[in-house]
Amino acid sequence: HGRSFIKMTEQNDPRNILAITVKNELIGAIGIHPKTDIDRMNAEMGYWIAETYWGKGIVTKAIEQMVAYTFGHFPDITRIFARPYGDNIASQRVLEKAGFTLEARLKATLIKNGVIKDELVYAVRRP
């Protein structure tokens, strides 16, 4: 997941990619990718965190801060979405805690390490 996130950051505005740190130690990252053209009212969010920090509420807080940042700095964005794997229950819970709702389940659309997975689409709308 970290590698795909890094690939996304290489194609993005560096101001939209933020480090997640604990005591000045990099433990993860979160980024927002505003879409263009007919999708310009949307932005995709991605994130990752080191496994030793899972379950501590850190990502939920980072997502909440990124949502506030995005809606505060991108007036045309009305929807932020994330696409966790269907079997990534922890990521689904984190998104739900941060106010995202499930919009879609796409069956067998992704492949990771040779395993075909469902893709979920979670989103939050501008209040």
Task: Identify the function of each model-found stretch.
Residues 5-19:
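A short helix-loop-beta-strand connector motif used in the catalytic cores of GNAT acetyltransferases and
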